[in-house]
Amino acid sequence: MSSSTGKVIIKLPKTSIPYKYVEPVLIEVDKLVNHEELVDARLRELMDKIRSENAVDMPIVVTPIPGTDKYLIVDGHHRWAAVKALGYRKIPCIIIDYFSQDVKLKTWLPGIIGDVKPVLEEAARRGLGVAECRYSVDTSGDIDAKLLEESSFIVLGRDLCRAISGGVEGQKIVSQVLNELNMKGLFTLVYYGELSEALEDLKSGWLHYLFIRKSLTKEDVMRYVRNGGVYAPKTTRHILPFYPAKTYTPLDALR
């Protein structure tokens, strides 16, 4: 995925997750809660697609938020936002058991090919602390849990370790910095679905810097959302037992 000014690479392991048809249910958009911030370009793209097809091509995946009458959006934030922005009242959904062992949660890890110095300088300019740390590619598995909790990211290079402060809220600032500088063409932005692959690329020299953060649990996500929190884009990576097959729900059914 790339644009005229910024290049983004998504690296995921190969999977054999099947597509499955599930009859969607229509849920009011105001009863759905997103847990990640939106990317404007993706939202506009989906609004145009939905308008041109006069339908929502596939249902979003949601789960009940315990103790409320609302649902957490597990997958489909931008489709939900597009339908809502277009003025429709409902959206097709598949309801899952979030805490089932069949539903996995992992965390996206950003990395860059290029110079990390502008990122660290801009993060500091926006109020985040940047401190030296003592970890390396070979000792990344030993990063102190308290340091991970308090940091937005631990940045590792072959000869560099920096802890950026801010915790989960700081991740939003760093994510914004990464996206802005990437769009200026300062570096290639890489998103990893698996830490092991990221570390291999870092060791080989293909990747220059990796941004490691605390892994989230499903309980973390539910607690954060119930407290009104919204993560940075590309934070959670949910792995479902199936991909929803396309159903093409007509827009007239969503009024």
Swiss-Prot record:
GO CC, alphabetical = chromosome
Q: Which cofactor does it need?
A: Mg(2+)
Annotated positions binding Mg(2+): D75
InterPro entries named among the record's database cross-references? Chromosome_partition/occlusion (IPR050336), ParB/Sulfiredoxin_dom (IPR003115), ParB/Sulfiredoxin_sf (IPR036086), SerK/SbnI_C (IPR023098), SerK_C (IPR040867)
- Binding annotation for O-phospho-L-serine: V74, G76, H77, H78, W108, K234, T236, H238
Q: What is its EC number?
A: 2.7.1.225
State the Pfam families in the record: ParBc, SerK_C
Note whether Kinase occurs among the keywords: yes
Instruction: Please verify whether the record's keywords include Cytoplasm.
Output: no
**Catalytic reactions on record:** L-serine + ATP = O-phospho-L-serine + ADP + H(+)
Q: Which UniProt keywords apply?
A: ATP-binding, Kinase, Magnesium, Metal-binding, Nucleotide-binding, Transferase
Q: Which PANTHER family match?
A: CHROMOSOME-PARTITIONING PROTEIN PARB-RELATED
Function as written in the Swiss-Prot or TrEMBL entry: Free serine kinase that uses ATP to phosphorylate L-serine to yield O-phospho-L-serine and ADP.
Q: What is this protein called?
A: ATP-dependent L-serine kinase
Phylogenetic classification of the source organism = Archaea, Thermoproteota, Thermoprotei, Desulfurococcales, Desulfurococcaceae
